[in-house]
Amino acid sequence: RKNHPNTILNTTDVRLLKDQDIPSCDGVIGGPPCQAWSEGGKQLGFEDPRGQLFLEYVRIVNLKKPKFFVIENVQGILEDKHKQSLAFIISSLQSIGYSIKYELLNAADYKIPQDRFRVFFVGIRNDLQNTFVFPNAMPGKKVTLREAIGDIIEKPRFFNEERVMSEHSTRKNHDVYTGSYDAKYMARNRVRSWNEQSFTIQAQARNEPQH
């Protein structure tokens, strides 16, 4: 809201939205909640109420009949345990008049300095008789952290005196030992080489990597 103060933002529960609540549009772009499909969760799929919101996306597309739509979600949705759910989602979108293509892409292959694997579903309305083709990975080397943020001036770090680490820590496999740290299998304060891409940046403001 602060970055785009003139944007019309409708925060109504998507399950309550009616046709007249949504303006006509050429395309619908969005990402149904990922928690039900994420490898970091219980992966309950449609058994999770958040997973059922995928069907609300289908409903909205059916209401507005845009020329195209784009759905983004986590790669966990491609796992075998969700095979039937994925087939149902695709058949539901096809049944309302769309040709569907989907593919797992990594943002790092498109000049983004971040390893971020996501599944993209693209639907084109059948009457348009157009075929969508996913772009190939961009040529050349990937953009590194050094190229993206290497010019940022480092600020002094302030340490929490109550969380000083013992010289004989029983916790091993740490990427970094300064400030609030965590094991390398978690996300907090992890550090990637300046010549690599960042870990996947999370939406929440906790467990974030340093870079």
What function would you assign to each model-found segment?
Residues 9, 100-104, 200:
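Conserved beta-strand scaffold positions in the cores of enzyme catalytic domains, especially
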Residues 1-65, 75-79, 84-87:
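Core alpha/beta nucleotide-donor-binding catalytic domains of modification enzymes
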Residues 14, 104-108, 184-187:
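Short alpha-helical segments and helix-capping/turn motifs at coil-helix boundaries
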Residues 92-95, 118-211:
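S-adenosyl-L-methionine-dependent DNA methyltransferase catalytic core
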Residues 35-39, 77-80, 111-115, 128-131, ...:
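Short catalytic/ligand-binding loop motif for oxyanion handling, primarily in non-cytosolic enzymes
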Residues 2, 21, 113-115, 192-195:
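Extracellular/periplasmic catalytic domains that process cell-envelope and extracellular macromolecules
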Residues 52-115, 119-124:
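Conserved Class I SAM-dependent methyltransferase catalytic core
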